[in-house]
């Protein structure tokens, strides 16, 4: 069975907190939007909001969408309450934690090990996007009240069936280039049906998130490990920011998730937001 449910996810799930409270819905606009509302009403840490189809998922930048046909992807949002664990500037540690947990879960289930593209994508070796992460949070009195990490992973989806996807969802969901030029999925990489992999990947992901979050509570940070997975590490890149374009060599990220760029004059620029182009 490819359709996920709360009972299926909890069955044999080896966690104490993460994924023990679940809402699973067949079709939704955005899992992040729904879980943020629940977070504001007191939903407990580890709460999982899961969907089998997403119609209006949001990307990191305004106007970008994450849209997925039924039962094709892992579409989830996970709630953290890290008030006494990390300060607001380090909220991206939770994004990194989830990205690393997802990489490990994918590798354990399929043998594939994706790379990371700053600031929030999992990509395959050809640079095509495999998963996206969107982190949203609430701060009060300089403390994190809650953090919602949303993830969309392309599991069993053939982007080469372009006309079918365009008719249903529009080009790239954003009016951009054809999806098969920019995105990929586990099924496309492996050359087989991967619908049965959604559940075990999700369960392994939740278990690995819990272990990594326990390490975070003990003071472990993940930016150095995260940096080692970065596409373009040690390579010349261009970063197109909101107000400025930067060029230099990628050094990794700092504890706040900011990109560290060594410029031609050997100075180090810290960049909080932007899109990376790698010059191979």
Predicted feature locations:
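Conserved active-site carboxylates
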Residues: 121
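N-terminal lobe of the biotin/lipoate ligase/transferase fold
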Residues: 1-108, 195
């Amino acid at each position: 069975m490819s359709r996920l449910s709360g009972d299926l996810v909890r069955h044999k799930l080896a966690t104490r907190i993460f994924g023990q409270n679940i809402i699973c819905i067949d079709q939704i606009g955005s899992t992040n939007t729904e879980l943020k509302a629940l977070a504001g009403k007191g939903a407990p840490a580890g709460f999982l909001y899961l969907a089998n189809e997403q119609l209006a998922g949001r990307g990191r930048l305004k106007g970008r969408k994450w849209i997925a046909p039924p039962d094709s992807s892992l579409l989830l949002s996970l709630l953290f309450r890290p008030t006494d664990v990390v300060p607001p500037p380090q909220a991206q540690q939770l994004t990194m934690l989830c990205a690393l947990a997802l990489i490990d879960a994918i590798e354990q289930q399929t043998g594939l090990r994706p790379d990371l593209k700053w600031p929030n994508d999992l990509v395959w070796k050809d640079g095509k996007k495999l998963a996206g992460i969107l982190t949203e949070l609430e701060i009060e009195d300089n403390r994190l009240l809650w953090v919602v990490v949303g993830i969309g992973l392309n599991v069993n989806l053939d982007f080469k069936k372009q006309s079918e996807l365009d008719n249903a969802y529009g080009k790239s969901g954003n009016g951009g280039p054809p999806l098969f030029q920019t995105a990929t999925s586990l099924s496309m990489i492996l050359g087989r049906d991967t619908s049965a992999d959604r559940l075990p990947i999700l369960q392994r992901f939740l278990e690995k998130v819990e272990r990594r979050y326990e390490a975070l509570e003990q003071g472990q940070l993940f930016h150095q490990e995260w940096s080692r997975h970065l596409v373009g590490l040690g390579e010349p890149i261009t970063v197109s920011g909101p107000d400025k374009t930067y060029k230099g060599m990628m050094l990794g990220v700092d504890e706040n998730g900011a990109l560290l760029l060594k410029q031609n004059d050997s100075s180090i620029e810290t960049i909080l937001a932007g899109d990376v182009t790698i010059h191979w």
